[in-house]
């Protein structure tokens, strides 16, 4: 159920923890998590105590609630959820209100961050913005990263309608930081709403087309214009420049050293976004819509020029697979199709193979279990994509097999 009335009531019953926090509220079709990860890492590098609320999680629900870059522990999370359960039960008994899962996790995040006395909370929307549970807060800055066709059954069937929903995070007099690659139709809607609310609109400069790839202590970084990040691809250059705009504003408003904070961008990590585990020859990427496929293809060509890839792909039944797969076919030597382990219907691997063969009959396609596909010996680099949920499954399998010294 979308809406804010019961979210406000839930927060009131748990003591309004949001009033103790300074929020940076981030919406967007793609890039929310990466932009948030840049900001969280930079603020922590400046010496601030940070909270970072994001979704979905990949392996453990604790990942949604990061305090100083570390997932909250089970005991603290259970304590917060117990308090929320008591409030939710009372709301159901007294008013017939049924608190949703996302409302509960959003309230838990506010409780946990307030309890940890976080200086800043990086606060990611779940879906849309206007009616999203995260939107009950009054932030110190708002951010909209990108707009594309997604969740059409909830947000609308045009870019303009989706932009209107995302623009719901804009608050009176609070500056909006807007991604550079916003479509014109979306920009018009968002700028009009910002003007109504007397909110200034700030955009970063264009990201450079190219960057230099360097390796430090076995970790690949891209560098450009004196900046350095582990996150690969032009889209991550765009996300970093957007985060940098926000950080510069925060440094002016809250009087901290911008240069020291900005050095934290180099430490930012965001799992299943062009992630390569130590000693692995597999790229894990949660790309799940046609726009993401274009970004993935572009990044593969930039980081591994001239290479072909063996793709492992699985997705949900409601996704636009044709456009996604068409984008990847020119880079593919083969596709292995897997089912996503979820209560949501998964796209049938045989249907996916038929889709590929309809426009690329020469490409090898097969079906396999995820574990088998990951372990298969192939002559080319493997790329796992199609769903963040699928990446979570794969990373969970890897966690059982070896220690991974990275957050996911």
Can you describe what each PLM-predicted range is?
Residues 53, 178-181, 193-216, 230-234, ...:
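Beta-strand->loop->alpha-helix junctions that form or flank phosphate-binding loops
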Residues 26, 34-51:
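A conserved segment at the C-terminal end of the G1
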Residues 4, 9-19, 45-137, 153-155:
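ATP-dependent carboxylate-amine ligase catalytic core
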Residues 181-202, 217-218, 281-282, 325-383:
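C-terminal helical cap/extension that packs against the catalytic core
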Residues 105-154, 187-227:
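Extended acidic/charged loop-beta regions that coordinate divalent cations
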């Amino acid at each position: 159920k979308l809406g804010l009335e019961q979210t406000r009531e839930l927060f009131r019953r748990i003591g309004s923890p949001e009033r103790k926090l300074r929020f940076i509220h981030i919406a967007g079709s793609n890039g929310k998590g990466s932009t948030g990860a840049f900001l969280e890492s930079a603020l922590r590098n400046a010496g601030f105590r940070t909270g970072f609320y994001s979704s979905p999680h990949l392996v453990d629900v604790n990942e949604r609630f990061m305090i100083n870059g570390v997932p909250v522990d089970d005991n603290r999370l259970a304590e917060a959820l117990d308090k929320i359960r008591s409030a939710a039960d009372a709301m159901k008994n007294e008013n017939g209100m049924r608190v949703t899962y996302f409302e509960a996790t959003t309230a838990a995040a506010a409780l946990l961050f307030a309890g940890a006395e976080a200086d800043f909370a990086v606060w990611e929307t779940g879906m849309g913005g206007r009616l999203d549970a995260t939107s009950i807060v009054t932030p110190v800055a708002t951010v909209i990263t990108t707009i594309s066709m997604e969740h059409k059954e909830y947000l609308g069937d045009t870019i303009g309608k989706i932009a209107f929903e995302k623009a719901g995070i804009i608050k009176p007099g609070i500056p909006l930081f807007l991604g550079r690659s916003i479509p014109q139709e979306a920009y018009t809607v968002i700028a009009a709403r910002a003007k109504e609310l007397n909110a200034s609109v700030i955009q970063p400069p264009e990201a450079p087309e190219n960057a230099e790839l360097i390796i430090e202590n076995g970790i690949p970084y891209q560098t450009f214009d004196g900046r350095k990040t582990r996150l690969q691809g032009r889209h991550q250059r765009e996300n970093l420049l957007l985060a940098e705009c926000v950080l510069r504003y925060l440094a002016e408003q809250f009087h901290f050293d911008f240069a020291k904070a900005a050095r934290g961008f180099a430490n930012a990590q965001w799992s299943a976004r062009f992630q390569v585990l130590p000693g692995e020859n597999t790229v894990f990427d949660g790309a799940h819509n046609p726009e993401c496929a274009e970004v993935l293809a572009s990044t593969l060509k930039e980081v591994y020029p001239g290479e072909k890839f063996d793709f492992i792909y699985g997705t949900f039944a409601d996704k636009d697979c044709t456009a996604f797969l068409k984008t990847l076919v020119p880079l593919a030597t083969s596709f292995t199709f897997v089912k996503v382990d979820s209560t949501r219907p998964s796209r049938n691997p045989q249907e996916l193979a038929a889709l590929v063969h309809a426009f690329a009959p020469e490409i090898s396609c097969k079906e396999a279990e995820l574990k088998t596909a990951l372990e298969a010996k192939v002559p080319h680099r493997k790329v796992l994509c199609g769903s963040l949920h699928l990446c979570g499954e794969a990373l969970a399998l890897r966690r059982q097999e070896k220690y991974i010294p990275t957050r996911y």
